[in-house]
Amino acid sequence: MQPLLTQDEAAELLKLSVRTVERLRVSGRGPKFLKILRSVRYRPADVEAWLAARIVSSTSEENTNDHR
């Protein structure tokens, strides 16, 4: 089992701000996460899967995973 990532580590891996990762989590649009007591943790595989789901081949392709 790979070590779990903190929110800061997940943000660093994704090259996003911690605040953006937090907003994505709260809105339900971010990677799957674990809530352990008061801590939020991410499995590396879930972060990578979330990122892979956002691959598009052109700018005209609609990203159906990112509704606002």
Model regions and ranges:
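Polyanion-binding surface elements
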Residues: M1-R23, A53
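Short amphipathic alpha-helix starts
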Residues: A10, Y42-R43, V47
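Intrinsically disordered and other compositionally biased segments
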Residues: R23-L24, S39, N63, H67-R68
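Short, flexible helix/strand-to-coil boundary loops that buttress conserved ligand/catalytic motifs
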Residues: R25, L37, L51-I55
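Short, solvent-exposed alpha-helical "recognition" segments
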Residues: S27-L34
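Short Lys/Arg-enriched helix C-cap and helix-to-coil transition segments
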Residues: L34-V40
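A short, Lys/Arg-enriched interface patch at domain edges and termini
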Residues: A45-R68
